[in-house]
């Protein structure tokens, strides 16, 4: 069913038992709760084109000193969404393999999909601040922020700027230009166990693994002079 409600996205505070006390409200310091996101679309920009599916996975917390990655990436949210316009690009459909005609019939209404996603994010984050992470951030953020503002009854759970670009983090830690910070340039120690499949949820999990690997990466040597 396209509007799939998984066991992982049912109920309030589904990940609270896996979060540090700071996230559950037992600590007054600000805490980030990270959510890796991936979208599959039928074109390059929201509005004229549509989100066809999106996936979210809880990706860890950070209190300014300690990063805690999940033991398992099993706190997830996935929806397939009804297109909002008649425009699409065949190349985009070839990449993600989604049946746009089926989604016109069976896809979830974007208003309910985005409102449910916002509720799930806020429930998992608890008292922490939800932060969207992606590699690169620009594409997924542009789509999800537009869709949350346009369709969610609660607006954006990430406000207008609570976001983290994994590509920039890698470039800074590796002391390389952004142009050289593609996923293909990741050293073996930072690569994920999951494969990139162009399924939104699977790619969000893959991305969450990369995010945690880079966040915890202590670079000892590098060929460049800072």
Residue ranges with predicted function:
Residues 38-40, 140, 165, 203:
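Acidic active-site catalytic centers that drive phospho-/nucleotidyl reactions
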Residues 138-161:
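Substrate-recognition/cap helix-loop segment adjacent to the acidic, metal-dependent catalytic center
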Residues 78-96, 100-103, 164-205:
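Active-site-proximal helix-loop-helix substrate-binding element of RNase H-like nuclease domains
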Residues 1-4:
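Methionine residue identity
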Residues 131-138, 142-143, 182-226:
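Acidic, Mg2+-coordinating catalytic module of metal-dependent nucleases/exonucleases
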